[in-house]
Amino acid sequence: MGQKRTMTLNLSEEEMSSLDQLALRNDMSKTAVIRKAIRIYLTLEKRMQKGEHIFVEDELHQARAELLLV
């Protein structure tokens, strides 16, 4: 991973609460959650730049929606 750097992150109460919940639910540190989110975002962005489409699917209701990064 290389040399680590420190940064200050300003989040709203709602965003901080979401981060806390994700960390707790997944038994991860907040830093690990943010790192994972960055990796996921980069993966999605790279695939979309190649012209690929990302979908979420609800098999129970036979519904599918395209994920868009805005």
Model-derived features with residue positions:
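Short, positively charged interaction helices/loops
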Residues: 44-70
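Short acidic/polar alpha-helix capping motifs at helix-coil junctions
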Residues: 6-7, 18-19, 60-62
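Small-side-chain structural scaffolding
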Residues: 8, 23, 31-33, 37, ...
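Surface-exposed, Lys/Arg-rich phosphate-binding patches that contact polyanionic backbones
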Residues: 13-32
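Short Lys/Arg-rich basic patches
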Residues: 1-11, 65-69
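Aromatic-enriched hydrophobic runs in primary sequence
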Residues: 22-24, 40, 44, 58
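Short, basic amphipathic alpha-helical segments that act as recognition/interaction helices
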Residues: 28-50
